[in-house]
Amino acid sequence: MQLYRFIVIGKVQGVFYRKSVSQNAMKAGYRGTVKNLNDGTVEVYAELLDDEISGFLELLKEGSPASVVHDISYVSANSERLEYDGFVIL
């Protein structure tokens, strides 16, 4: 497992995006966190295997019914493991 940091750009705040991502990620068995940033984007940390990245990106693109995702960037995060179980909204 590797920890990845995702930044989601678009209409992703005030539209239940974090709640939808958290619920769908937990259903799929992912561990991570999702958090609003001051610049209007959403930051997501997730522990994934390399072959899970494309499926997780689809989950992030889906978001909530009212959200509109314009772009998602991601990098490998330099951290050992998450401190949380499940998928936590911060």
Where are the predicted features?
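Intrinsically disordered, low-complexity, mixed-charge
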Residues: 1-90
